[in-house]
């Protein structure tokens, strides 16, 4: 089921062509919303009748407040939820985990009201289940908003050795992870708790490690993922553009750069730790220079163009989960 849906997604990707060393390389780009976290005030209900189980247990008394904390055990009895840590996992009819929901451990400072959050991957929810989950969000949450949105782009059939050379030049932490062959498999930019963390990873290798079946005819498969939290989740369009402005590779440096500039960019790319040995002005100079390189980079420009083509559809998907609440699409 999962493989079938994935294959359908890949065949609907944006077809692109990269020209490098006088060769035209066909590849595909596919943008998606990979994960969503919604936070909102928890609604309270009251019913005019008492709810009693078949065993005679009273799970709700008429006139009392009915909240998320009371609803989840009832769902669990119906095999629609399962306790998981401080929260609950929502299950589909096959028993698959489709979402995680919890009551936040603190009250809203301004109102003193109880808040909750729900976290899910929209790509893993079948169409007929989306309605149920949206109904659940509408039923339980008041004034919902995004606290996290992961925007991802699958880069399909572009050679590993080409894609794994790309870096972000932003002044954030960089953590690379390499495979047994010494090739890059995953790279993180930014702290996990920060408002923006970027990950570039070999999706094909990840799926093989998990022993998951791959779609046919996919030779190479990378994913560029931007994990946006708190206020940055509402500014997702702007953040994606800012990220791509800094996404570059030293493989095709412009001819107008001096030999020293080329050596510096190549060296800083090869050994990220060297950035720490530069003074502020020199860092600023070469970060600015790397962003100029990104403006001329073919893959980066394809990513920007395909994202612009996908923004409206991604916006609709996000907006759809919040029943008409417009998310921030400012591209300035």
Write out the residue ranges for each language-model feature.
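Helix-turn-helix DNA-binding segment
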Residues: 280-288
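Structured, helix-rich domain cores that form ligand/interaction pockets
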Residues: 1-278, 293-332
């Amino acid at each position: 089921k999962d493989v079938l849906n994935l294959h359908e997604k890949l065949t609907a990707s944006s077809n692109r062509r990269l020209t490098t060393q006088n060769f035209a390389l066909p590849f595909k780009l596919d943008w998606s919303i990979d994960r969503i976290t919604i936070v909102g005030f928890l609604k309270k209900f009251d019913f005019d009748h008492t709810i009693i189980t078949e065993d005679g247990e009273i799970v709700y008394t008429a006139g009392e407040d009915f909240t998320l904390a009371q609803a989840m055990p009832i769902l669990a009895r119906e095999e629609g939820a399962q306790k998981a840590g401080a929260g609950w996992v929502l299950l589909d009819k096959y028993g698959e985990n489709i979402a995680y929901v919890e009551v936040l451990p603190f009250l809203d400072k301004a109102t003193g009201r109880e808040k909750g959050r729900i976290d899910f991957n929209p790509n893993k929810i079948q169409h007929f289940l989306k309605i149920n989950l949206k109904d659940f969000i509408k039923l339980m949450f008041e004034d919902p908003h995004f606290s996290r949105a992961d925007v991802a782009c699958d880069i399909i059939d572009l050679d590993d050795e080409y894609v794994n050379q790309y870096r972000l030049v932003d002044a954030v932490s960089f953590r690379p992870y390499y495979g047994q062959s010494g090739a890059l498999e995953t790279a993180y930019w930014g702290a996990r708790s920060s408002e923006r963390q970027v990950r570039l990873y070999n999706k094909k290798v990840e799926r093989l490690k998990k022993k998951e079946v791959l779609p046919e005819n996919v030779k190479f498969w990378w994913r560029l993922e931007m994990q946006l939290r708190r206020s940055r989740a509402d500014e997702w369009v702007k953040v994606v553009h800012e990220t791509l402005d800094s996404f570059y590779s030293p493989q095709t440096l412009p001819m107008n750069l001096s030999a020293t500039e080329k050596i510096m960019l190549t060296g800083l790319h090869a050994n990220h730790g060297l950035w720490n040995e530069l003074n502020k002005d020199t860092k600023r100079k070469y970060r600015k220079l790397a962003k100029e390189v990104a403006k001329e980079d073919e893959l980066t420009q394809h990513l920007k163009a395909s994202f612009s083509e996908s923004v409206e559809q991604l916006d609709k998907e996000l907006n759809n989960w919040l029943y008409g609440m417009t998310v921030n699409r400012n591209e300035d």
